[in-house]
Each structure stands twice: as C-alpha cells, then as structure tokens.
Regions:
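Outer membrane beta-barrel
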Residues: 1-87, 92-112, 178, 199-215, ...
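Hydrophobic beta-strand residues in large extracellular and virion-surface proteins
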Residues: 18, 131, 170-174, 207-209, ...
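Detector for outer-membrane/organellar transmembrane beta-barrel domains
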Residues: 95, 107, 111-233, 240
Length: 288
C-alpha cells in the first residue's frame, strides 16, 4: 500500500499557510494539475521533475518536507524544502531538495484546494490569465552511490480561460521547462555498476487549447481540444507527440468521457520511444 499524502496543515491566513509531512513538491502547472483535472488524456509524455518519478526521490510528485504557501492579492507563492533523493543513491551529505513557485493572476484569482491548480474550470471561475515560474534544485540529486551529480530545473507556464459572449469557454495552457542534471538515462555514471537515479537533461515544451461548446447535448457538453508536446534532450534526438481529443463533460472533473487520437514518439522519460498512432476511449469518474 502506498501513502500518497500524510501531513499537518497550519493555515493561519490566506497569505500564510504551512504544510508539513508527505506532500506535493511545488512544481510546474502540469505537476500541480495532477491527472484528475486534465483537459487532455496523454499529458504525461514529457520529462518529469525528480519527485514525480516513482523512485528514490519521491512518489507521484510527493516527498517528505514542508511547504510555506499563500495568496496575497493576485500573487500566489510556494516555498518548499524536502528530503528529495535518498542517500542510497549518492546523497551521503543529505542535501535537501529546494522548490519554489511564484504565480500572478492578471484577471480572476484561481481558486483550488490548497496550492494545487487545474487544467480547466469549464468557465465556472470566469476569465483567467495566470503566468508562473517554478524552480527546483538539489545538490547530489541524481546519480549513483559511487558517483553523484546535481539536479536543477526551472519552468515557465501560462494558463488562460475565457468565457465568450455566446457562453462557450476557450481554454489555453502552455509551458516550457529546462532540466539540468549531471547524469541521464543516456549518459549514466561511467565508473559505477551501482543502480542510478538518472534523469533527463534538456528542455521540453507543450501547448494545449480547447473549446467547451455552450449548448448541452443530453446530460453533457462537448469539448474538442488539441495538445502538442516536444522533448529535446541534450544527449539524444528530439521527440514529439500531438493529441487530438474530444471530451464529453457531464459533471466537470467528476464525470467525463474522452476520445482521443495521439501520434508521435514522446514519453515521460524525455527520450524518444516507439513512434505510434493510438486511439483511446477513457472514462473519468471521481467521488468527493
């Protein structure tokens, strides 16, 4: 059994909150959206930050640590310190993982549980335009027991949702991230036979656009979308995937049906996989 979240929450004021325990590391927007509010189906075809892998630096974007966060007017800030990579992989000095995010809401202020974000609100929060920058860093945050290396990453993202005059909703999200590590899947430590926590070194970008039709058809509304993802490692060839999809939104994030066609060779490692063309039908149900 996996423990996803286990934390103490000290919530003094909207501008000052402290979460301590096993919790989500401040990340870029796809990381804070999670899989349950995504407008697209295949969003995890890009390289991840270290805690996002199911490995020694965290699980599902979580690690043990603390996050100071809050909202002041239109500014939203996150400052975190975490355990990050374990000493079994070369972090013998127990260097910590530092993570931070600063976002600014130019129009309506986004409202979510805690410091999470969403990939679409289906127009329920009005007109939104948010930009953000994210940083993560850990000395000895990659490599092996015999030969450790550092991890550093930054990301920029933008999110816009606009309710049009016909009550339709246009949603746009885009982001760019760059990850700098000493050891990668393609360039592991040469002087060691130990297991390696090797990541991606390079840059990645994505963009998603969708439109929610205003008129209901039966119990739901149709939302066509397109998403493009591109990965550019420094030690291998580039890869990309394009996804065309159609959501049938019945009850927001609680109930929807997805049909999508995806073409390309991008995957979560950041390195090119098989070049495939797939058609997927999915059902999202959440009870809360």
């Amino acid at each position: 059994m996996m423990t996803i979240d286990a934390l103490l929450r000290f919530e003094f004021d909207p501008s000052v909150n402290l979460w301590v325990g096993r919790t989500l590391v401040p990340s870029d927007r796809p990381g804070l959206n999670g899989p349950y509010t995504g407008m697209s189906w295949n969003q995890y075809r890009q390289p991840l930050f270290s805690a996002d892998y199911d490995g020694p630096a965290g699980q599902l974007g979580r690690s043990e640590g603390a996050v100071l966060w809050g909202m002041k007017n239109k500014f939203h800030y996150l400052l975190g310190v975490f355990e990050g990579l374990e000493d079994d992989y070369g972090n013998d000095s127990d260097h910590l993982l530092f993570a931070g995010r600063l976002a600014y809401n130019f129009l309506n202020v986004e409202s979510n549980p805690g410091y999470y974000t969403s990939a679409t609100y289906y127009g329920t929060q009005g007109n939104i335009f948010t930009t953000a920058v994210t940083l993560q860093s850990q000395s000895d945050g990659t490599g092996s027991k015999a030969e450790s290396g550092d991890f550093f990453a930054y990301a920029f993202d933008v999110f816009s949702e606009r309710v049009l005059s016909n009550s339709g909703v246009f949603t746009f999200e885009a982001g760019y991230k760059e990850i700098d590590v000493d050891f990668t899947l393609a360039s592991p430590p040469t002087a060691s036979t130990d297991k390696c926590f090797c990541l991606f070194d390079g840059d990645s970008l994505y963009a998603t656009a969708g439109y929610l039709f205003p008129k209901a058809v039966g119990p739901g509304k149709f939302q066509p979308y397109v998403r493009y993802m591109e990965n550019n490692p420094n030690d291998a060839g580039s890869s990309d995937t394009t996804e065309w999809g159609l959501n049938y939104v019945i009850a927001g994030n609680k109930a929807s049906i997805n049909l999508n066609y995806a073409s390309g060779d991008a995957n979560a490692s950041g390195y090119a996989g098989n070049d495939t063309d797939t058609v997927t039908i999915g059902l999202m149900l959440q009870f809360y």
